[in-house]
Amino acid sequence: MRTVCLKLFMVFSLFFPAFWSTFNEDYKMEYYAVFTAAYAALLLYMIFQVWKGKRKKEQRFTLVYLAILILYNGLSLYMNLNYLHWYGEQINNTVAFLFFLVLMAYEDSLGEKEEECIRFFLGCAVLSNVLSIVYYFLGYTAFLICNNHFYFVRLPEDYYEFRHYWIYSHKSDYALMLIGFMAVCIRFRDRFKHRASWFLSMGVFLVALFLSHSWTGFGAAALIFAGAVLDRIDWKKFRFQKIYLLWAGLLAVAGGIAGKLILAERDLLSLGGRREIWSGALKAIRETPTGWGYLFGEALFDATPTWSVNNAHNVFLNAMLRFSVPVGLCFIGMILLIAVYSLVRSRSFLAVGMWIGFFLLLNMDYCLLNYEIGMFLFVIYLVCIYRPKGKEEVWNGMVETKGN
């Protein structure tokens, strides 16, 4: 039953992203998601896991993690009761973070059929993005299911660039998830029956990433591919050869071409005005340390004397801007704790590249909303922490037979 619940979570997350929101207005409803169908499936999974599953021995990480999660909920409840009066973020984030805790704390975390669960996820991720590409060429940008209504979104005809969101709130959210999906495919490349199917799957993700028009996403993708290459090297036997200079030159040429394409659209030195936006956001946070609450999405702060924006274009700054400094710091602490622990557990360059890519995206845009965190954490678990039970696996040059 646990595997079935996880499959339901995948189907809802990747095909039918139904959620309920305080608002129906475009651009605000995603910011104020109260609950999701995917998280209902996660609640069922956690109930069955706690009821039927076998707990691992106590781990220091899970105790520290649980302590920060309890602190996060205590501070969120206080701020909601006294200032913000909106509980959707606290509810959704708690479900997502508890899900990661249960994955960490119990044996057989993927349920009764672990291998089937992984293959099902890989298949769903690829198929979802095949549908995404078809959806784009039909002329649509985003697909949402909110408050029992279907939204088929198109960009304005005179929009300044092409971009694609698929079932996510913004192109940067989509890019973040695509980076995660590619990392999972690299991590479990041996689960594909044929090498051609793996290359085709990666091609689907790269085409989808191109359609998203997230140049930061392509930088993050380069990092995970670099990490994957470094993981394939047997460093004990490594010897420098002149042919490597040729490969380095080809990479430099490819990087130069990519840089020229990006510079034709973006001023990289200005970071798209991010420094001014972040400075303005910090000033707004200092002025309202208890958080904006329902004002977020409507209220503006000054990035420059002649330019105002409605969000910090940064996941961590927005957490403080929206939900107060104490709650935001707890949220940041949770993400950093997960990052450090998963990197220590993975001992792989793939994980390092993935996390650097994640942090690039998380710091450049508001690319992780509460109803997306569950899938984000699931991807991190699969890439960095999960180990096939009783199965030998080559992992960063070492053979492991540990369970998950």
What function would you assign to each model-found segment?
Residues M1-W51, L71-M79, F358-L360:
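N-terminal signal-anchor transmembrane segment
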Residues I118-N147, Y168-H213, G217-D231, Y341:
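Alpha-helical transmembrane segments of multi-pass inner-membrane proteins
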Residues V134-L138, A228-L271:
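A membrane-periplasm/extracellular boundary helix in multi-pass inner-membrane enzymes
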Residues R2-M10, K54-I68, E114-F121, A196-W198, ...:
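Membrane-interfacial loop-to-transmembrane alpha-helix junctions, especially the N-terminal start
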Residues A264-F323, F331:
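Long extracytoplasmic/lumenal interhelical loops at the membrane interface
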Residues G53, R60, D190-S197, A222-I233, ...:
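Hydrophobic transmembrane alpha-helices and their immediate junctions
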